[in-house]
Amino acid sequence: MANTRSAKKMVRKIAARTDVNKARRSRVRTYVRKVEEAIASGDKPAAQEALKAAQPEIMRSVTKGVTHKNTASRKVSRLSARVKAMA
């Protein structure tokens, strides 16, 4: 348990930041899921549009400190490869 005033304040700040980061991570997952659903349905134009919407959101999570740069790049790369491989 936090004893000092500053430690108690940090507990509050960390809790608030955690909530924001959870929301950002969830938002990224939603965009990725939309791309994967479009890929699974076999609709290439929809998959391309979903990827176009997901890519900036994934990279935004990097600038906000939620995701590591390499992780985001890997996600974008693998999704775009799967969309490109569609017939």
From Swiss-Prot:
Gene Ontology BP, a term: translation
Biased composition, class Basic residues, residue ranges: 1-15
Record's GO cellular component terms: cytosol; small ribosomal subunit
Chain intervals for the UniProt region annotation (Disordered): 1-22, 64-87
UniProt keyword terms in alphabetical order: Ribonucleoprotein, Ribosomal protein, RNA-binding, rRNA-binding
InterPro entries registered for this protein in UniProt: Ribosomal_bS20 (IPR002583), Ribosomal_bS20_sf (IPR036510)
Entries under Gene3D superfamilies matching the protein: Ribosomal protein S20
Top-level taxonomic group: Bacteria
A Pfam family: Ribosomal_S20p
Any one Gene Ontology molecular-function term assigned to this protein's record: structural constituent of ribosome
Matching PANTHER family: 30S RIBOSOMAL PROTEIN S20, SMALL RIBOSOMAL SUBUNIT PROTEIN BS20C
Entry similarity comment: Belongs to the bacterial ribosomal protein bS20 family.
Job of this protein: Binds directly to 16S ribosomal RNA.
Record's protein name: Small ribosomal subunit protein bS20
Organism, scientific name: Hyphomonas neptunium (strain ATCC 15444)
Organism phylogeny: Bacteria, Pseudomonadati, Pseudomonadota, Alphaproteobacteria, Hyphomonadales
